[in-house]
Amino acid sequence: MRGFDGYAPSGVVMKRVLVVGAGLHGLVTAAREHIAKNQVFVVEKRKRIGGRGTSQESFGHQLEHGPHLLLKGGELHSMVKKVSKVKPSLRPVRPSKIFVVGHGPLYPINNPKELLNVKMGKDKVREDALRLISGWGQDIPERRNALIKGKLCVVGEGWSGLVGRLASTLEEVGIPIQTGVKITDSYEGGVITSKGVKIEADVVKMCTGEPVGEAVKVSTLDVVLDNRPLKGLHGLVKDDVAILDLAAIHSVKAPGMSHFSCIALSGGVSKIEDLLDERVSGWRSHIITRRENNSITLTDSRGLLSDGMI
């Protein structure tokens, strides 16, 4: 790890900055405050850092909370590259290898007429599918364009690997991260924990993941199969359900197998299972491991994804 010392502006007065929350947003905020030559301290109410960027190991596979695609060249990618000696291993999702059920390839490069309709915005089904894959239903033009240009990527080490890189670098430069600390109140000059302990700070950054306005909930399913029924396809889309085969996109993900990372904007996990039943016959008999969330926060009224909140 290279640390942050080479990126700080000169002539800046040091402040005591407390970052509340050690998810992706909190860790990046802590890194930026250190770059600004401030004294930084991080607290997290849970026993584990990472927030929704955590993973669960099962039978040698890392299962996350549904699919995560990193915007290559975006702010998060740039920050991770700054603090790491080794660049994260990225492989792009190819929209030409995603099949829209009843419609064909998401980006029909071998059909000039259909491709022209997509480019002119005259194909609503594919337009909705592009929005689903690029922004999980959120309208984020930058990510839509990135998907078409091969700049929305699966991360070899997973989202949790990016969290780990940031946390390791913070530790290396001496920024303490204390878990199991719940903040219950604030006062002029700091905050108070649930145990009545006062923590003094000039600036408090709240990065707890609390939604702004109304939370947008989705359902996710991650499942590893011992076969490859999609035969190299990167994914499937039907209505508001998307299935990505991470193993087909990135070679380090379940080699020789399938790692389906799935999301449904409505209808729950059963909606995902219905699509798998329809298009991947017999998948249940090939399950190695699975992880599901019937309701998990995707975003809030801001419409930003996790790597867009930093």
Where are each of the predicted segments found?
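Conserved acidic residues
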Residues: 16, 200-202, 307
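Extreme N-terminal leader/targeting segments of oxidoreductases
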Residues: 1-17, 36
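Dinucleotide-binding Rossmann-like beta1-alpha1 core, especially the glycine-rich loop
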Residues: 59-130
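Conserved flavin/dinucleotide-binding core of flavoenzymes
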Residues: 2-7, 249-310
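Glycine-rich FAD pyrophosphate-binding loop
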Residues: 34-58
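N-terminal Rossmann-like FAD-binding beta1-loop-alpha1 element of flavoenzymes
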Residues: 15-42
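Mid-domain catalytic core of redox enzymes
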Residues: 182-275, 279
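Active-site/ligand-binding neighborhood in enzyme catalytic cores
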Residues: 103-189
